[in-house]
């Protein structure tokens, strides 16, 4: 019989530096009004020159571990979802393991962009259900400012840096009810970032055009994908666990764009008062978006024991993912 799994605790960390829309007005041809109306974003957090993705991940993880009162020796799995590792190897997860002295854990990264945290949750859940481990540290961490083209006004207004974490543990009660995961590689080049040195991108190309290795996005196409796939992913996972959208107490979508969030909520007939939104403060933090929002929702008392919570994300790949959680 499969072991039940619950979220034991959550944590987050964002850098101190705030980059406002008014700051961006001085960098590119844009305005606070233009950004706010089209995205809902007012500001975002940006790392300084010495802070790495690992640093962000470690702080979020430590926050989650402190809340749970769990010892380093009790963590036996670490998964980091990121598209901005500072090294190809060792993995960010192994670097986190080193910093937090998680000597009994095995550790690895996954790359699923903004869907990555839920992908990582699904992997950790199945490891725990099958008795392979008991306590998994799952982290979404990004330093997107390092791969943002700060001269492209259509994308530089969107992204921010940060990390969120959750500890998943075996439980007598069933907390995590189910998942829906998917991908569409056929349309992967609607949103991408080159890995210089490992593909057809040469050093000379990057030297001539530093923005060659930055985020590229066909915004209109990604928007059309997002407004369809988020409701689809939620409907599929609810169907799997025998629930309907009216059963949802708290809806936490990937924090990419307020118009996408409002469209998804409307299609699902979920009132906005059940939707948790914090993108006005942080922008799109990719894999960190959902765990940061989840931790804030818990901290603010938006999630109570017994609540049914839906998380859903979409991102580069193209990918999508959703999960239903009963808060126990």
UniProtKB/Swiss-Prot annotation:
It catalyses: malonyl-[ACP] + acetyl-CoA + H(+) = 3-oxobutanoyl-[ACP] + CO2 + CoA. GO terms for cellular component: cytoplasm. Residues 255-259 are annotated as: ACP-binding. Pathway: Lipid metabolism; fatty acid biosynthesis. It comes from the Bacteria. One of its GO terms (biological process) is fatty acid biosynthetic process. Its EC number is 2.3.1.180. The active site is at residues 114, 254, 284. Pfam families: ACP_syn_III, ACP_syn_III_C. InterPro entries: ACP_syn_III_C, ACP_syn_III_N, FabH, Thiolase-like. Its main location: cytoplasm. One of its GO terms (molecular function) is 3-oxoacyl-[acyl-carrier-protein] synthase activity. Keywords: Acyltransferase, Cytoplasm, Fatty acid biosynthesis, Fatty acid metabolism, Lipid biosynthesis, Lipid metabolism, Multifunctional enzyme, Transferase. Transmembrane segments: none annotated. Gene3D superfamilies: 3.40.47.10. It is found in: Cytoplasm. NCBIfam families: fabH, PRK09352.1. Catalyzes the condensation reaction of fatty acid synthesis by the addition to an acyl acceptor of two carbons from malonyl-ACP. Catalyzes the first condensation reaction which initiates fatty acid synthesis and may therefore play a role in governing the total rate of fatty acid production. Possesses both acetoacetyl-ACP synthase and acetyl transacylase activities. Its substrate specificity determines the biosynthesis of branched-chain and/or straight-chain of fatty acids. PANTHER family: 3-OXOACYL-[ACYL-CARRIER-PROTEIN] SYNTHASE, BETA-KETOACYL-[ACYL-CARRIER-PROTEIN] SYNTHASE III, CHLOROPLASTIC. Homodimer. Belongs to the thiolase-like superfamily. FabH family. The last Arg residue of the ACP-binding site is essential for the weak association between ACP/AcpP and FabH. This is Beta-ketoacyl-[acyl-carrier-protein] synthase III. The lineage of its organism: Bacteria, Bacillati, Bacillota, Bacillota incertae sedis, Caldicellulosiruptorales. The gene is fabH.
